[in-house]
Amino acid sequence: MAAFIAKQMVGNQLSAVKGAVGGDGGDDGDDKEKAEEEERERQEAIKEAEDRRKEKHRKMEEEREKMRQDIRDKYNIKKKEEIVEAAPQEEPNPLMRKKKTPEELAAEAEQEELDDFTKLKNQIETQVNELKTQIEGKCVMQ
């Protein structure tokens, strides 16, 4: 490892000295083109390696899932997803419930307010009707 690092350091310095001593000005354009081409090739190689890795991973997952399904079939085991779906229906957890947005809370408060208003209105109407019947009962017209 140390040899590699030393070689890189000395190699870079040696390249700089060669460029300064040689004085070739035309090579800079070629060097840039070569560097760009090498960078493109490197990026393509990285992409190909990543694609191969993903494909290998996908194949392994398919094989694992097939093996899991064979075991499930052999021992008559249901998939976990089916079991998980049945559990929340039995006993809802209040800590895991959906949180209400401020808009929902405002709508609920408005609904409660309307309910209170309706209750008060009905209460007042019943009291007025009771008073009306009491007054009519006391004042009998002949």
From Swiss-Prot:
Region (Disordered) residue spans: 13-70, 83-105
UniProt keyword annotations, A-Z: Coiled coil, Exocytosis, Lipoprotein, Membrane, Methylation, Neurotransmitter transport, Prenylation, Transport
Main location: membrane
One GO molecular-function entry: syntaxin binding
SUPFAM superfamilies: SNARE fusion complex
GO terms of biological process kind: modulation of chemical synaptic transmission; negative regulation of neurotransmitter secretion; neuromuscular synaptic transmission; regulation of neurotransmitter secretion; regulation of synaptic vesicle fusion to presynaptic active zone membrane; synaptic assembly at neuromuscular junction; synaptic vesicle exocytosis
Ranges of compositional bias, category Basic and acidic residues: 31-70
Membrane-related topology note: Lipid-anchor
Subunit structure as annotated in this protein's UniProt entry: Binds to the SNARE core complex containing Snap25, synaptobrevin and Syx1A.
Protein family according to the UniProt entry: Belongs to the complexin/synaphin family.
UniProt name for this protein: Complexin
Source organism (scientific name): Drosophila melanogaster
